[in-house]
From Swiss-Prot:
Stretches the record annotates as Atypical RING finger domain 2: 87-96
GO molecular function, one term: ubiquitin protein ligase activity
InterPro entries per the UniProt record, alphabetical: PPI_Ypi1
Compositional bias (Basic and acidic residues): 107-119
Pathway per the UniProt entry: Protein modification; protein ubiquitination
Pfam families: PPI_Ypi1 (PF07491)
GO biological processes: defense response to Gram-positive bacterium; negative regulation of cytokine production; protein ubiquitination; ubiquitin-dependent protein catabolic process
Protein name, entry field: E3 ubiquitin-protein ligase PPP1R11
Enzyme Commission number: 2.3.2.27
Taxonomic source organism: Xenopus tropicalis (Western clawed frog)
Reactions that this protein is recorded to catalyse: S-ubiquitinyl-[E2 ubiquitin-conjugating enzyme]-L-cysteine + [acceptor protein]-L-lysine = [E2 ubiquitin-conjugating enzyme]-L-cysteine + N(6)-ubiquitinyl-[acceptor protein]-L-lysine
Amino acid sequence: MAESSGPTAGGGATSSTVTTESDTQPEHRSLTLKLRKRKPDKKVEWTCDTVDNENLGRRSSKCCCIYEKPRPFGESSSESEDEDDCCESAHCIRGHKKATSGSKETPSSHHDKTGSMQH
């Protein structure tokens, strides 16, 4: 719709007013939220057969081997521990095998002089 007014008698300015009508419809936007189950935190759970790590209340699941404390030169390893405690299980993830009496490899040969594991 448009309106205009004509010239005034005194020779004044002409003014016009323009009005526009539009059919504006509100936009209908939809928002979809997808809820996802939160991932659980990674946990380590110990079973009753997990070996205590050096009697300190800590537990280890990396290997079935038991750490052997370095001994002074000449001390026999059989004096304080059984030879049956070495890695003979088939589930050892590091591939350790029990040393046979015919081989020169001992269960502690996987360790260097500082007592850490060598692989």
